[in-house]
Amino acid sequence: MEKIASFTINHLELLPGVYVSRQDKFGDTVLTTFDIRMNRPNFEPTMNTAEMHAIEHLAATFLRNHKDYADKTVYFGPMGCRTGFYLILHGDYKSKDIVPLLTELYKFMAEFEGDIPGASAKDCGNYLDMNLPMAKYLANKFLNDILLNITEKNLVYPN
């Protein structure tokens, strides 16, 4: 079997950032999948499931209620390796195009107070596995370390 595209990225050189993972075309429709890499793979500890789960709930809710992106948001969810998330948007985008959206999102998550949306037994299959304080810490770290100081090396996959 052929290696899928995401396994051809050199993860030893990959830095935290926002990358276009792939674009899929269906007739006139384009779906852009973003790699939102919050941790440096194989160098930093991975995120735990509890904070990732909290980020997933907060981000999915924020994006699906966003005035400009609600109708363009297809999916937001965790990577199996626990170093980041995938965001799929309807449209033809470059990484830099969504930095303002992600800055807004990560600021929202870093400052979030209250009950995590959907964090109940009725709404979620694993609602007890959430860690809001750690999710806020990680969102704030990614916001300040990466999004507010983003450079080309955090927007384009390494060769």
From Swiss-Prot:
GO molecular function: iron ion binding; S-ribosylhomocysteine lyase activity
SUPFAM superfamilies per record: LuxS/MPP-like metallohydrolase (SSF63411)
Cofactor binding remark: Binds 1 Fe cation per subunit.
Xref: Pfam families: LuxS
Cofactor section: Fe cation
Gene Ontology BP annotations: quorum sensing
E.C. numbers: 4.4.1.21
Catalytically driven reaction(s): S-(5-deoxy-D-ribos-5-yl)-L-homocysteine = (S)-4,5-dihydroxypentane-2,3-dione + L-homocysteine
Record InterPro entries: LuxS_sf (IPR037005), Metalloenz_LuxS/M16 (IPR011249), S-ribosylhomocysteinase (IPR003815)
Entry keyword set: Autoinducer synthesis, Iron, Lyase, Metal-binding, Quorum sensing
Protein residues bound to Fe cation: H53, H57, C124
Leading EC class: lyase
SUBUNIT field: Homodimer.
Record-stated family: Belongs to the LuxS family.
Function: Involved in the synthesis of autoinducer 2 (AI-2) which is secreted by bacteria and is used to communicate both the cell density and the metabolic potential of the environment. The regulation of gene expression in response to changes in cell density is called quorum sensing. Catalyzes the transformation of S-ribosylhomocysteine (RHC) to homocysteine (HC) and 4,5-dihydroxy-2,3-pentadione (DPD).
HAMAP family: LuxS (MF_00091)
Name used for this protein in its record: S-ribosylhomocysteine lyase
Organism lineage string: Bacteria, Bacillati, Bacillota, Clostridia, Eubacteriales
